[in-house]
């Protein structure tokens, strides 16, 4: 693996997660981010034995973008606590079908995950096991039949953005699970563009940014960069 490293120190490793790569080893047997980065660190620093690299947040397999990993157990524990207490910030970009009625807004839903199918559904508030999902969005640009959104998560539920936008009637382009029919090989147009954390040791606020790749459908919108 030759990772795209955004930041590294003794406590953190921040990389750009490639699209269509699982973050951890799974039943598919496909190369995963954690294993690849462990091997890279082991070779880079000539480390004997096992390399610790903790996963503290998740990105769905088809989604790319900023990924923060912990190089020590202490850093992993502190970062996990930040995420649990909603002290981190995460911003995504998405391209959806259609033109939204409002240029900005907040979506509030209640979601329920089916552990057998791993699908997530919008349900009523009083459904047993339902969890509140909140996100804020703004429209960045339009193209014929598509809109680019900037999304800030207020909660971090599985498949949250994908399910909420589909429920709004504007599924993400390329989302084979919750969207419209997609051609084989089409990647989902969802990208984690910003991650904000407090450094687990110094406490300094840190902001990591990366823009989506210049491929379809992102390329249709030109070079719109993050602020």
Question: Residues of each region from the PLM?
Answer:
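RNA pseudouridine synthases
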Residues: 1-227
């Amino acid at each position: 693996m030759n990772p795209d490293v955004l930041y590294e120190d003794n406590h953190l490793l921040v990389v750009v997660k490639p699209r269509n790569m699982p973050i951890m080893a799974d039943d598919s047997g496909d190369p995963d981010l954690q294993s690849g980065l462990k091997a890279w660190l082991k070779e880079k620093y000539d480390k004997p034995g096992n390399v610790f690299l903790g996963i503290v947040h998740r990105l769905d397999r088809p989604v790319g973008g900023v990924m923060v990993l912990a190089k020590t157990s202490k850093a992993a524990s502190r970062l996990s606590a930040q995420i649990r207490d909603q002290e981190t910030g995460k911003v995504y970009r998405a391209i959806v079908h259609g033109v939204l009625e409002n240029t900005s807004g907040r979506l509030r839903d209640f979601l329920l995950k089916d552990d057998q199918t791993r699908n997530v559904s919008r349900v009523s508030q009083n459904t047993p096991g339902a969890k509140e999902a909140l996100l804020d969005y703004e429209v960045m640009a339009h193209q014929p039949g598509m809109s680019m959104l900037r999304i800030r998560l207020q909660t971090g539920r599985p498949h949250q953005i994908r399910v909420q936008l589909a429920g709004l009637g504007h599924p993400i382009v390329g989302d084979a699970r919750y969207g419209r029919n997609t051609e084989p090989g089409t990647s989902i147009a969802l990208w984690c563009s910003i991650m904000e954390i407090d450094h687990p040791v110094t406490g300094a606020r840190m902001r990591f940014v990366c823009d989506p790749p210049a491929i379809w459908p992102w390329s249709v919108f030109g070079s719109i960069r993050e602020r």
